[in-house]
Amino acid sequence: MALGGGTFTSQNKELPGAYINFVSAASASAALSDRGIATMPLELDWGVEGEVFEVTNEDFQKNSLKLFGYAFDSPKMIGLNDLFMGAKTLYAYRLNGGGDKAANTYATAKYCGVRGNDLKIVIQKNADDTSKYDVTTYFGTVKVDTQTVAKAADLVANDYVTFKAADLAVTAGTPLTGGTNGTVDGTAHQAYLDKIESYTYNTMGVVVTDDVTKKLYVAFNKRLRDELGIKFQLVVYNLSADYMGVISVKNKVTDTGWSEAALVYWVTGAESGCAVNKSCQNKKYDGGFTVDTNYTQNELKAAIKAGEFTFHKVNGVVRVLEDINSMVTTSDTCGDVFKDNQTIRVIDQLGNDDAVLFNTKYLGVVPNNASGRTSLWSDLVKIRTQLQELGAIEGFTDSDVTVAQGDSKKAVVITSAITVVNAMGKLYETVTVA
């Protein structure tokens, strides 16, 4: 069972855990966890089915053919290349599993998918021992495995095929055929969400254009952020979500064979990898897609007001206009500062790190007395001090954190004030000319 978490309005929670609210300051109107972790459900021609699988940036560059069916520099991998421009680790899930595996007389593809049809088996007599055969597996034009055996039963499955108990015979190349991708529907998306709920990551991205699927992911994001205390941001394409946890990408890509929503790959990676003391504002788009930036100045202003994460062209270079989320409606406790993704990175860092600290070090272990609360206070101060040293917050002092006993003997109430530092975004300059 997961520990309790999320926000609170009164001290009446039943599950043990950390419940944390972030509110705006009144106005006129232990260790920090790493970033760079993203998750995405993907439509693939090859790969693991029915499970979340972890891929690091290094894995992608070295093992892309084995993992995804194409070399990392293939045009088919532009999206994932964009993602790994910013992300260090991806928790991937294949949406279109459940299809047919390609096969021939000698072997069956390891995974379903149309890419399995590019496998072939070459069998030759061994030059040194004619009683044996050299059995070679090709993936496209790439030789991926060779084994020398006397009979098929001696063959060992490799990363691409499993072998059948067939009589070996010389062949210049017998292709595998019949591989198909599975279908993608709401059930596939829900299966991914069910699997990924227990993982920890900074951003989730989904490359879809229909509002029904987008709203499924928004509901998931809101439930985990607000009810379970699992802080992450969701990146979608062209949706007015009006929520700090959702980033809505305005621009489309114009590349043939790709969804117009494909910029979600790059934004998901960039936001996951952006340091807690940094911003993506004015960040150069260094990905592989052609971005539609055909907007007037007035349209760009309107996009900011609408909470749209927008790219624009500056001196021929595509850059991020503002590092904002989709939130547009403000209140006394949730002001304009929460529209900025740098603010969300800071509060998500605090929310996640405070919860991990409490749930792993204090929950059920440390007594709720003056000494125990002082220890918790000290650890909370350390986390905020580290953020201040990084330049993510400013003006923090020890007195900005208080830890007190709650309404019950087991409850602890923490009050914490922070001031988030945001990157420079506007320059107002007056020049006096003599």
Question: At which residue positions do the language-model features occur?
Answer:
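A glycine- and small-residue-enriched flexible loop/hinge signal that marks low-structured segments
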Residues: 2-23, 29-48, 52-56, 60, ...
